[in-house]
């Protein structure tokens, strides 16, 4: 069976047994900030297991894409060197959320392996937690597993927990026996670390909750979480020992080898590259782009490791991007997102390889030079840090290279240098805390801003300098918390509302609104009277400002959809700031937008504005929202109930902000700036409505003023400027010609002043009223006409001298070089050995300096 057939057989088996087929979640966990990448099938169900989420099914089956590289789960350094380490793998899993438990889970696993895949029972080995008598009884008495192929293990191997506290439980594992020809003993034995018995399926039974004292309490609804690596299972079914020998890997390995010449198909570098094209491609599909921090840096490390191994194989660069199509050949049917993102993946990989190739050779030469001069087995941390800091070598790449030569790195010194760099960076980015900062509050406010812009409310909390107080007097800056509010608290990129809180004897100007816990906090200043707890107030949002914000926020949704349409489906929102006067939108893309693309985007958005579609908001559960095609923002955490914003069939996104009622309310949309803010991240700044009209009028004003200055009309402005540029170019040519003629004449006039010293023709000459450009022309003329020449030309004006020196290439090394001559004469300057310039104050002993130069030449 092919790997793809095994995957499908697994999914079909459990779907037929009442399991909901759930698509693989993103490699970027949306519900666990502690995880760098999704590394197991249960990650997307974590909140279900914790009881924080409900779904319309109690059984699920998945083929989950996983990455283990960086962070706690880092297999990178072993990838390619062992039979089963990967940065990317597929985890097959079936799950029960309070439905079936141990008996059914064990029955399903055994039946699938022995009856569907026809693995002989005598080649399987089972382990259980030593205290789990229930699972032991099911295996031995009901499944009739031989006691000779069964073992009990301790908590370290067969008891799983989510953390120090929380859900946990025993697990049972199924191993495949590769036969006596492979070294190693059964699980639980002293020789268990060998490769004979390989774990293929782990069944976790979550039946307890561990408290802070370590006591176990039975869960009201025990659950099942299982995981089986597709690559390991395919190796078993296909009768091979290494995962790299299975069909999908062999296809990639052969494709890589075809890019080079006479490459041994067992070469470790082929395995490294085959693994890395999988993880890199899927990370890019899920929105990760190479960068110098976080997930982006892990991706960069993997790409650079692959490029280094390609260099080792002698593959012509760039090569890595050419492997996307072979990957699609073996995985595109299961993951069509690969096909849809092919061009984007190729572009990113090619761009990153080209960027790294420029420094790879230099870094490798530096490293090899240091290795040759090593007196021991340890490379200094300073060299490793220089490779990282100057040549872009991730530390694990350097470790990879020197490990191949039996060496290691002084990691302590490297880490110290890294820490110093981090501290310097942190010191350079210190910031001050806002006066109204507050970390947590117990109050709770109810938001009514979707329906209202003003309402009656009661003060339930007052803050000053971050502390709760009982009153705020006139002139005091602080914050007010209300039981009900129409004020929108800053969230999702939309700024907080401004406005007034008004009473009979007081008023409070709201300058900002933030959310702290469940409380909506109104920051500002008391402009009349005194505020105390329990006062009734009238809350009034600045509706003109709110309306402008609404237009901008709705426009960002139209912009997002237009970017995907014009630039590509790889575009993902990476941030935004929606204010009243303008908005900015950050998105993933690898190069600047062209003027043509910007124009197309504006045309698409303005067409949607003219369509005047109704902006429809629906509240639904997160799963239904995603199934409806709503776009969820990259890395955003959503609650069970979400707001889905639709504008015709052009845009549908999850969003909690305030919006226009119809797209036509926006009026006009203009992009005013586009630029990069980080590697792979672009930013668009835009204006809408009356601010867009004001911007257009301002640009027209500039154009009219410029036309008046140039004595033409706005319609003829481009033609006029083109003619001016052409005239300027012709005048520059004329000036250059005159300068050349002047230089030739000056050069000819002073040829008679050459002084010969030991076969070297020395010419030192002060020129009158000559600019730097003419001096350079004169120098070029003289050097072309004088052999074995040392030429120094200088001008003096207002006690400042400008110096240029030239040395014929055939005498470099036999005389002071040009830069040394310039510095000797005027103290400052630099350039090449054969040509240099400088300037400074005229030395008091100028004649002595000239005499010393002659003496220096005589000594050489």
Swiss-Prot record:
Keyword annotations from UniProtKB, A to Z: Aminoacyl-tRNA synthetase, ATP-binding, Cytoplasm, Ligase, Metal-binding, Nucleotide-binding, Protein biosynthesis, RNA-binding, tRNA-binding, Zinc
EC nos:
6.1.1.7
Q: Which InterPro entries match?
A: aa-tRNA-synth_II/BPL/LPL, Ala-tRNA-lgiase_IIc, Ala-tRNA-ligase_IIc_anticod-bd, Ala-tRNA-synth_IIc_core, Ala-tRNA-synth_IIc_N, Ala-tRNA_ligase, Ala_tRNA_ligase_euk/bac, DHHA1_dom
Q: How is the cofactor bound?
A: Binds 1 zinc ion per subunit.
Location in the cell reads: Cytoplasm
Give the UniProt record's GO annotations in the biological process aspect. Answer: alanyl-tRNA aminoacylation; negative regulation of DNA-templated transcription
* Gene3D superfamilies in alphabetical order: 2.40.30.130, 3.10.310.40, 3.30.54.20, 6.10.250.550, Bira Bifunctional Protein, Domain 2, Threonyl-trna Synthetase, Chain A, domain 2
Report the superkingdom from the record.
Bacteria
Record's comment describing the protein's domains: Consists of three domains; the N-terminal catalytic domain, the editing domain and the C-terminal C-Ala domain. The editing domain removes incorrectly charged amino acids, while the C-Ala domain, along with tRNA(Ala), serves as a bridge to cooperatively bring together the editing and aminoacylation centers thus stimulating deacylation of misacylated tRNAs.
NCBIfam families to which the protein is assigned, alphabetical: alaS
Name of the protein: Alanine--tRNA ligase
